[in-house]
């Protein structure tokens, strides 16, 4: 037994030794040999799945796993440069710090002198190239830097400009980066400087251009603003301040007065608010008040009470008043996306038109440009400072009283009639002389002037006016201006032509006040040879009537026809005398404008067509020549977008029987590619029959040049100087009507309301025309019939 135990023990030791040595040898071999790619490893199951979806992984050292752990990408030399293009991104309106420094460089100090530059200064005497004076070379650099973020604007703008035929005169708009002020905050902005206005030799040769070229928009156009948080906060503050105005709070407090029951609020508003003031207040909050989101903008008390109050509101007014009274205005801090968009365009929310949207964000129904880039107020200010003879440095116009009394802001007026007694002026003759002195004299400007004021309704003054003017001229007495009031008040046929002819050929100021009942402006033709700096045409009556007409040829040498002093408003008491400038929406001509001695129609009509061209195109950037609807978006360069007078009056030109030969297109500038169209035409006639030749009718242009088939009133019309006495159309001559002539005749009957339905007279020997017209459904009469002979 001992032997067996000993043998077993030896065998166990031997086997153990062999096993240990095998393990040791295997470990040594494994440690010294290269690792197999199929070897096992231990991976933590705590890690998240990590699948690497790439085709450049190194699988040489991969371990079997359901995850792509511990895999490395095969290094490539090329990926390194890829981050390099990243510096190009420039899309954000708010530049990143490095880019901001780049933008600042162009505008460093070249643009700081902008304030003295103010833009009105170049306008008074801009000659051909006022605007791009100081900085052409400097502005080129920023233009190249700014184009990448917004390529469309610079590239699209020049496209329409090349259309005009004149060679390199049309310079593309240039952009520059400069500091501008919005809501009292200085920010960087890309500003487009407009090119000088295009001029044409034809206009200069024919006396159609303004002797002192006019610029409507003298300020640059903001293309993009780099919005800052400071600007956002300031804009939000201004809007928020308006939303919680004291008068709004008083309105709401009154509605929630314990003495007014909730169900009585609507009737109370109807009784006390005739102007819709409450409705205006509700419109500012309605979008938010009509959503449950409003609870997030209530004060603590409002939040607690709102769930219970929701069921107790008896009307919108009750609900809105309660919600307004419980608002926490400090929570209105964010501008809407709409406001952000407009800020980037240089437009700030107008506080008075502001509102809160359904998200509690601040928005507005109207937006205002930066003060110095407001094209309307800058034009008015420039005209007041540089076009007015007695100028002042504000954008607002003269009040009705100031206009009627001859007063000007910033000027002192005194009676100086005694100094002119030797010229025959007497007490009671309606003639006064006033001295005007600037309160703060300006170097290089008129600081003292004399105005002769004449009341044309005074027979004594009217009779001696011409003589007085001649005496003052002969003795070289410096008169700055003449004011003639009450023209045509007692006698609409009062003659002023001789008085106006007697005026000096060089006159700074002429103001004419037409009576409300007299629209006769034919005497103004006497001004054609007078060089006048400022002409004011005013009335105390209705200044918007279609009957107000003017011969444009009378204005050829007038530098500025005052259009600023516009005092038309529904706020004025009906029937009261309100002095205002007249809006002329009708052009008229005189007999001598038609050249009877010329051999061809174009030459016969040259003065008339030149007058039309001056108004429709050459000087159409001036407000006076834009009729009743004002300028387009680019009045100096895209005249086709401007308004214009839409009436023609030929009642003083008997030779004109239709629109034949009249030119309504711009023959000099191809980009003005739409013709002007009319809504009113008045022809001379003193008979029952309106006589026209076949050529006049075939080429009448009625269907081509008059607005027809428009649903919106008023309807276009053709009238005659004898009113409704014109009953028939008499077509004279041999031959028949062309297709155009047939259409023109139909248009004539459609628009001339005085005509008897389709009643036409033809010459007795023109059977061809008679048959043609009868076939078209007209009632045709023979001119030899005694019933149709005009005596």
UniProtKB/Swiss-Prot annotation:
Cellular compartments per GO CC: membrane
InterPro entries in UniProt: Mycoplas_M_dom, Predic_Ig_block
Region (Disordered): 56-175
Transmembrane regions: 10-30
Coiled-coil regions listed: none
Biased composition (Basic and acidic residues): 56-76, 98-124
Keywords: Membrane, Transmembrane, Transmembrane helix
Composition bias type Pro residues, residue spans: 77-97, 125-139
Topology of the protein relative to the lipid bilayer: Single-pass membrane protein
Compartment(s): Membrane
Family stated for the protein in its record: To U.parvum UU044.
NCBIfam families membership: mycoplas_M_dom, predic_Ig_block
Record's protein name: Uncharacterized protein UU046
Natural source organism: Ureaplasma parvum serovar 3 (strain ATCC 700970)
Upper taxonomic lineage: Bacteria, Bacillati, Mycoplasmatota, Mycoplasmoidales, Mycoplasmoidaceae
């Amino acid at each position: 037994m001992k032997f067996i135990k000993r043998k077993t023990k030896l065998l166990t030791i031997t086997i153990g030794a062999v096993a240990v040595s095998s393990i040791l040898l295997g470990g040594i071999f494994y440690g010294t040999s290269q690792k197999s790619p199929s070897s096992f490893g231990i991976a933590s199951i705590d890690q998240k799945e990590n699948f690497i979806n790439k085709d450049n992984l190194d699988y040489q050292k991969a371990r079997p796993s359901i995850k792509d752990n511990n895999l490395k990408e095969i290094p490539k030399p090329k990926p390194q440069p890829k981050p390099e293009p990243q510096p190009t991104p420039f899309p954000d309106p708010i530049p990143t710090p490095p880019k901001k420094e780049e933008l600042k460089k162009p505008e460093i100090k070249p643009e700081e002198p902008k304030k003295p530059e103010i833009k009105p200064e170049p306008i008074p005497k801009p000659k051909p190239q006022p605007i791009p004076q100081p900085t052409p070379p400097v502005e080129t650099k920023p233009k190249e830097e700014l184009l990448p973020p917004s390529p469309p604007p610079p590239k699209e703008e020049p496209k329409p400009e090349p259309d005009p035929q004149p060679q390199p005169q049309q310079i593309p708009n240039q952009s520059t980066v400069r500091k501008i002020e919005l809501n009292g905050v200085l920010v960087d902005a890309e500003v487009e400087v407009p090119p000088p206005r295009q001029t044409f030799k034809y206009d200069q040769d024919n006396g159609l251009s303004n002797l002192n070229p006019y610029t409507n928009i003298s300020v640059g156009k903001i293309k993009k603003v780099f919005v800052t948080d400071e600007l956002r906060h300031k804009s939000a503050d201004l809007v928020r301040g308006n939303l919680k105005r004291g008068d709004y709070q008083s309105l709401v407090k009154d509605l929630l007065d314990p003495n007014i029951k909730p169900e009585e609020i609507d009737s109370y508003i109807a009784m006390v608010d005739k102007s819709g003031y409450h409705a205006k207040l509700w419109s500012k909050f309605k979008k938010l008040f009509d959503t449950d989101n409003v609870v997030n903008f209530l004060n603590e008390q409002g939040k607690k009470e709102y769930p219970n109050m929701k069921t107790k509101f008896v009307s919108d007014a009750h609900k809105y008043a309660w919600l307004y009274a419980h608002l926490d205005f400090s929570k209105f801090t964010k501008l809407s996306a709409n406001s952000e968009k407009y800020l980037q365009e240089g437009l700030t929310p107008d506080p008075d038109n502001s509102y809160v949207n359904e998200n509690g964000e601040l928005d507005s129904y109207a937006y205002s440009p930066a003060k110095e880039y407001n094209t309307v107020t800058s034009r008015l200010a420039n005209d007041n400072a540089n076009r007015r003879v007695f100028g002042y440095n504000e954008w607002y116009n003269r009040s009705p009283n100031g206009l009627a009394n001859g007063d000007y802001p910033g000027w002192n007026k005194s009676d100086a009639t005694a100094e002119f007694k030797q010229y025959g002026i007497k007490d009671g003759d309606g003639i006064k002389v006033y001295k005007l002195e600037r309160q703060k004299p300006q170097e290089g400007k008129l600081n003292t002037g004399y105005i002769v004021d004449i009341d044309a309704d005074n027979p004594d003054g009217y009779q001696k006016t011409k003589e007085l003017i001649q005496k003052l001229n002969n003795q070289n007495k410096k008169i700055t201006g003449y004011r003639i009031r009450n023209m045509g008040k007692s006698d609409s046929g009062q003659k002023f032509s001789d008085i106006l002819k007697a005026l000096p050929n060089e006159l700074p100021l002429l103001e004419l006040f037409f009576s409300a009942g007299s629209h006769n402006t034919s005497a103004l033709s006497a001004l054609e040879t007078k060089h006048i700096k400022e002409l004011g045409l005013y009335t105390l009556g209705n200044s918007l009537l279609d009957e107000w007409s003017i011969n444009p040829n009378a204005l050829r040498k007038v530098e500025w026809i005052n259009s600023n002093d516009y005092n038309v408003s529904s706020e004025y008491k009906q029937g009261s005398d309100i002095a205002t400038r007249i809006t002329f929406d009708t052009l008229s001509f005189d007999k001598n404008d038609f050249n009877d001695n010329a051999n061809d129609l174009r030459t016969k009509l040259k003065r008339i067509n030149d007058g039309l061209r001056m108004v429709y195109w050459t000087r159409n950037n001036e407000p006076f020549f834009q009729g009743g609807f004002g300028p387009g978006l680019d009045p100096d360069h895209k005249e086709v977008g401007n308004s214009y007078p839409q009436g023609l009056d030929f009642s003083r030109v008997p030779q004109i029987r239709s629109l034949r030969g009249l030119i309504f297109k711009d023959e000099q500038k191809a980009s003005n590619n739409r013709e002007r169209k009319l809504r009113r035409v008045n022809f001379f006639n003193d008979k029952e029959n309106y006589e026209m030749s076949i050529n006049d009718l075939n080429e009448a242009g009625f269907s081509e040049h008059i607005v027809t088939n428009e649903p919106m009133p008023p309807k276009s019309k053709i009238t005659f100087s004898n009113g409704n006495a014109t009953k028939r159309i008499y077509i004279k001559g041999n031959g028949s009507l062309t297709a155009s002539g047939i259409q023109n005749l139909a248009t004539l009957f459609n628009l001339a309301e005085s005509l008897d339905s389709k009643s036409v007279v033809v010459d007795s020997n023109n059977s061809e025309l008679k048959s043609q017209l009868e076939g078209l459904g007209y009632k045709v009469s023979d001119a030899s019939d005694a019933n149709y002979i005009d005596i």
